[in-house]
Amino acid sequence: MAAQLEQFLVNEGQVDQRAVTYMLKGLQLESLSDFASFWTSKDYENGVRDDIISKVAPFNSDLSLPAAKLQVARLRAAWRKAQGKPSAAVPLQSAKPVAGSVVTATKDTGFCEKTGLESGGVAHGGALNAAQVAHLDEDAFKGGLHRPKFDSEGLHKPHTSGGKTYETGFHYLLEAHELGGKNADGGFGGPLCADPFSPEIEQLCQALVREAQDDKTLCFENFTKPCPQLTKKQVELCKGFDYGDKTLKLPCGPLPWPAGLPEPGYVPKTNPLHGRWITVSGGQAAFIKEAIKAGMLGAAESHKIMADTDHHQTGGMYLRINQNGDVCTVDASVAKFARAKRTWKSGHYFYEPLVSGGNLLGVWVLPEEYRKIGFFWEMESGRCFRIERRAFERNGLMIMRQATEVAGKISFVFYVKVSNDPESKPIPLQSRDYTALAGLDNVPDSLGNPYTCEAKDLDYPIKRDTWLDKNQEEMLKQRSIVGTAFAKCCDQGFEAHDNPKGGALTAAHVESLGKENFKNGLHAPNFHDDGLHKPMEAGGKVYSTGFHYLLEAHDLGGKNEDGGYGGPLCKDPYGKEVQSMVENLLVQANVDTTNAFDNFKQPCPQLTKEQVAMCKGFDYGDKTLKLPCGPLPWPAGLPEPGYVPKTNPLHGRWITVSGGQVAFIKEAIKSGMLGAAEAKKIIADTDHHQTGGMYLRINQYGEVCTVDASVAKFARAKRTWKSGHYFYEPLVSGGNLLGVWVLPEEYRKIGFFWEMESGHCFRIERRAFPCGPYMFLRQATEVGGKISYVFYVKVSNDPGSKPIPLQSRDYTALAGQDNAPDNLGKPYKCTARDLDAPTKRDGWLDTNKGAMLDQREKVSKAFAKVCEKGFEAGDNKLGGALNAKHVEKYGDNFKNGMHKPEFHEDGLHKPMEVGGKKFESGFHYLLECHELGGKNASGGYGGPLCEDPYGSEVQAMTEKLLKEADSDRTLCFNNFQDPCPQLTKEQVAMCKGFDYGDKTLKLPCGPLPWPAGLPEPGYVPKTNPLHGRWITVSGGQAAFIKEAIKSGMLGAAEANKIVADTDHHQTGGMYLRINQFGDVCTVDASVAKFARAKRTWKSGHYFYEPLVSGGNLLGVWVLPEEYRKIGFFWEMESGRCFRIERRAFPVGPYTFMRQATEVGGKISFVFYVKVSNDPESDPIPLQSRDYTALAGRDNAPTNLGKPYPTLAKDLDYPKKRDGWLEKNEKEMLRQRNIVSSTFRS
């Protein structure tokens, strides 16, 4: 029997043998029946993960890794499959009726009289029926309508139904979410698709999502047609409207048809929508997010619910469609819709009551066989959202793609058809054309074009929607409960709640910092009289310096209600996944030239010393005063306000995932708040902190925002501004800031801010965008011509704080002058009148004026500025990316981020001394340097993806791969058979003494020819497969020594001695740390060969590398496909070109990268294994050397004379010099001389 179980798990379940062995020996499962009955249907999803995979190596090292997730998914599928086996028991949990409840059916209709749902069927599956809800309260379903009686305080309170108490009403809705979607056996599959949640379908969905995002054939001209919306007045007119009365017209007038909607008339021939469909993307997680957006759920509750429901499948969302030509009855989840089914006809309005108590009017049109296009009015908001559903066959399955557009943003959900039988019954057709069209035929669309329609209900003369009629009172009650669920109030500028761990900034948070430091909602700390560098006491606690106090204040108000930083949209903003994305985004940002103010090239205004002096002592609290320096000029290039965002994309809580405390400390040093010695001490004290603490809580309502931010910089926790209008901020430093935000489009805001004490203006752009499952906000700040980037991730759609009233400072900042000009003299449309006029004073500032002046004096005399060297900041001597601690012992051999060792004047074969240590030869020194920067943080080579790259398992794989590589004939450059270019002796001589640091010079030898057979660039990788840390598992030191002998750097006698000395070393030391973002990569590699530790390149563009030997290298990498890169490299001292191909691929649980290098017709292979998805190093800005290498010539030819499409212009033009090389030119020339005279080749 055990053998039968093993055979089933391995052959049918494709479960890993290690997991199977544990089940047989560890859990002592002896038969298929044992496996099938080991968990209940309620527990198996968690069970296979917690009881098996979490106990089996290597999966238990990180259950979030793809390999572990795959095994969990396969075991779940195997357990479900085992339920159908003859020897397996089926431990399904049937719902139990409440005592006294009876399920009765009407003989004629087949519907239950009490619930209005279908009678018959089983409790654990099938179409929604009376048996499935018999365990709930008697009145949870009546007349076919779902009307749960939630707690009067809202859905976040516990809810009891059928004797069972749910933690919240939302937990109840989650259970209701799946009602009616399962098959008769309690599963989701069916005859057309047995397992809709299999890994194969998950992979298919990922491919379909990528295809969908590139599709430009969506309805409404790819959703570019304008979408109608009701005015506030129209929404108000419909308040209290009786949607149950079919004889009434909408009081707001007819709803406009969306422009671009096709007309009905087509009648499908094959009924392709008919059947049962299960969601295979979206599901419960998406449902929770939507509920948060809709105000049904707050941040703390959603966080808890997400944790409770992690074990659930994606599914639960479903469609049961009875299609008969152009008429459909559709069953869908009762968690959102109040009733389980509705029947509609193509081109006619239908009505839906929502569980939230709201009202929806919508239309589906079937313009062709496999497509339906719809739009839906949410009458409480006046918004219209548009949808397209498209059915198609893929891999033997029928898929339906749903594209939903709300306010210009398109999202996709996919369904798979699991059965041609919807397993539910149709209900009679009714329509709401008369009401929705307000009795008017041929109502126009949103562009004024008449649309063929008749304002008469299809079920006329029926006068009332009886289902709604029976439940009107309950629906109104639900709407009230949902609307008031999470209301909070504001108290003297702080939120009124008593959670000391997290939430918006409140009195409970600041109590420990001393009430005297927070007054009237203003942060006014009492620093030491001598400045911030002196100790201070607050709330009975003594801080080493005022800055230590500010660091603690820095993250006040940014945490969630549990005291962490995450939220329902992003649980771990400091996890590897998000941090990896951020590193890629930083690389992309550094090459972006689309920033505001013409990429910040427009001149930035600045006040003169005289104007700054005029404003000294100005009373910024008095809103009736004009600035004595005259109106502040608008920065040239600022867009004008007027656009009103439709979707409020900034609304929510955002956490900084780059920058944070370390960046805050650096900024404090720059601004003179903190000196170097103090900074080192503080950084040491705060290393244990997360990056975060910096945060934004934004309440957005169109063009008006209330923003909560760190009180470490701003004296008050929140401010409200309107697009295009000045607001005022007192700073903790005692300074004064006047600024403006403009919202020129949906996902972007552009601002500028005047620091009135210095007269400086700094400009900012914030841009929101999705990346993977997350929403990021990129902040680009320009000060003095330098652009820096900070990234935020949205962790919750709930800001967790409340807005405060709007005020502005237009009169003061514009000195009473309308249409004040920008700094180029061009008038900017504006009115110099405060939005909150006739308010005369800023009361908050007025109350705290004395404290602010005192703070300004203390900050101004604190410290001076410092600057850092050119290696990554870090203090880990054992490992990590190359940092100052690694190279500290090598003294002046590392300067300005460059490796420039001082070898013996007679050559590398002679002894040398570095940092007090004597090396037998320069080459022994280089061998030690060879490993710098390649190790993990613990000083080893492994990582989470491969713990032991030099273990027997990986080495056996590598030996096999080396043998396979020798017989591979699919290498680049036509298997390296295409001729390889080479410079002539004359060309090499021309380049002697060339200044490679000058980016404005052309190579004197003419353009370097492209190697024949090189693919053209243009492909942009989607998954960044090269991103991470790679360790060499073949080649390494031994290969490095051999190459040194060949190149003349080392003779045979010395080589024999060195090989004997280094035999005890691992193969490794050679490594790659790659930060990949699409077709741009920053690569860290060994400083034993390359003089600098890292370089950034873009596919198809030349980059330059100075070599430790003193030579110069110009090369190109091209990324022609997802897992491959092809390159060539010119050694300018020899004139030789060597060609390389790197190819990444999975083998077993590992990802390998094979490097094929061709020099002089001979091919050699080196293999790397990826040990971590985190490169553990930072990217640097992109630069290129196209102009120099191509000698200023576009479309330079290959060595066979064929033009290659190129542009001879550097990507970082107009930058004129390579600064790193410039600082080290003299030393590089010296090294070249020493290396060249070492040995005979």
Curated annotation (Swiss-Prot):
Residues 491-842 are annotated as: Luciferase 2. Residues 868-1218 are annotated as: Luciferase 3. SUPFAM superfamilies: Lipocalins (SSF50814). Residues 114-465 are annotated as: Luciferase 1. GO terms for cellular component: cytoplasmic vesicle. InterPro entries: Calycin, Dino_Luciferase_N, Dino_Luciferase_rpt_sf, Luciferase_cat, Luciferase_hlx-bundle_dom_sf, Luciferase_hlx-bundle_domain. It catalyses: dinoflagellate luciferin + O2 = oxidized dinoflagellate luciferin + hnu + H2O + H(+). It is an enzyme of class 1 (oxidoreductase). One of its GO terms (molecular function) is luciferin monooxygenase activity. Dinoflagellate luciferase mediates much of the bioluminescence in ocean surface waters. Emits blue light flashes with a wavelength of 475 nm during the night phase. Belongs to the calycin superfamily. Luciferase family. This is Dinoflagellate luciferase. It comes from Lingulodinium polyedra. The lineage of its organism: Eukaryota, Sar, Alveolata, Dinophyceae, Gonyaulacales.
